[in-house]
Amino acid sequence: MLKNDRLLRALNRQPVDRTPVWLMRQAGRYLPEYRATRARAGSFLGMAKNPDIACEVTLQPLQRFPLDAAILFSDILTIPDAMGLELYFVEGEGPKFRHPVRDAAAIHRLGVPDMETELRYVMDAVRVIRRELDGSVPLIGFSGSPWTLACYMIEGGGSKEYARIKAMAFNAPELLHHLLGTVTDAVIAYLAAQRAAGAQALQVFDTWGGVLSPAMYREFSLPYLTRIARELERGTGAERTPLVLFGKGNGAYVADLAASGAEAVGVDWTISLADAAQRAGGRVALQGNLDPATLYGSPDAIRSEVAKTLDSYAQGNGGSREGHVFNLGHGMSPDMNPEHVGVLVEAVQSLSKR
């Protein structure tokens, strides 16, 4: 039995006593205790692949701030790593793959990993975290979106131009669809396994969907997000596990995402919550959408922006604050001040009381 079920109630558009709040990258380098754990573990992957350390890092922000959810400490690139692409990290450059997939032979060799063998460390982390949370708040599991994972798998790492994957979209769209289909199968299996291990809410991060034109988004990202929402077994009634579809630059597609079958849509700061709520039309909850850079502001500026965000949602939702989960529009940066995060959380709690 959850002691704090605000997140789950809000994602299901049920009444809550105040707006729940959690933050993308709430467990991260801005926390000195995270940096100490990382130094001890030796690397990011050394933390992510050790269930006990992943649990420790997941719980760190909850020991500082009265957040309404924990999110599994992991990485979106665990699936392609388990497919054999071999994930590694370069300081200052981010994630890379030793074996990117760029031709038909490589793509057709890919299969869905076994979730309790190749990705057992993730499921073990979920189980350990659930035990340690002891019902205090829900645990969110997550995956990257098929399009976003395919970007990394083809480019071999992060990119500014996405030239390789866009070239494939234009020159060999059927091959790209084959890859996206395989990755979607893996994402569905991965999220289902996290749910079976104990995740109580799920989120898909479509980090790079916003680099696509509207026509390409509707061909190469949206159908696969919709497939996840419709095919992922999440239970029924009060036991149903809510799914959030988050994307950077997805404001133009809120109505499409609201029709996907997901319980909630996460948006960034490039669309107002009032506009997003009107587009959603009451079909889904909304999550977001404070610009993370707000945390560089003064405490008064942070409180002011929190108030504006809460009011914007209510404005687009017929005056009601129900069905809103407060979050940033993207993850926090390493140089942000933990004290300012505390100001944000306190402001959401005090300003959103019903």
Curated annotation (Swiss-Prot):
Q: What is its EC number?
A: 4.1.1.37
Annotated site location: Transition state stabilizer: 75
Q: Where in the cell is it found?
A: Cytoplasm
Cellular component GO terms held in the UniProt record: cytosol
Q: Which GO terms describe its biological process?
A: protoporphyrinogen IX biosynthetic process from glutamate
Q: Which UniProt keywords apply?
A: Cytoplasm, Decarboxylase, Lyase, Porphyrin biosynthesis
Q: What pathway annotation does it carry?
A: Porphyrin-containing compound metabolism; protoporphyrin-IX biosynthesis; coproporphyrinogen-III from 5-aminolevulinate: step 4/4
Q: Taking the first listed entry, what is the main subcellular location of this protein, grouped into a coarse class?
A: cytoplasm
The catalysed reaction is: uroporphyrinogen III + 4 H(+) = coproporphyrinogen III + 4 CO2
Q: Name one GO molecular function term.
A: uroporphyrinogen decarboxylase activity
The UniProt record gives the binding positions of substrate as 25-29, 75, 152, 207, 330
Q: Which HAMAP family match?
A: URO_D
Q: Which family does it belong to?
A: Belongs to the uroporphyrinogen decarboxylase family.
Relate the protein's function as given in its record.
Answer: Catalyzes the decarboxylation of four acetate groups of uroporphyrinogen-III to yield coproporphyrinogen-III.
Under the subunit heading, UniProt states: Homodimer.
Q: What is this protein called?
A: Uroporphyrinogen decarboxylase
- Organism of provenance: Xanthomonas euvesicatoria pv. vesicatoria (strain 85-10) (Xanthomonas campestris pv. vesicatoria)
Gene name, per UniProt, is hemE
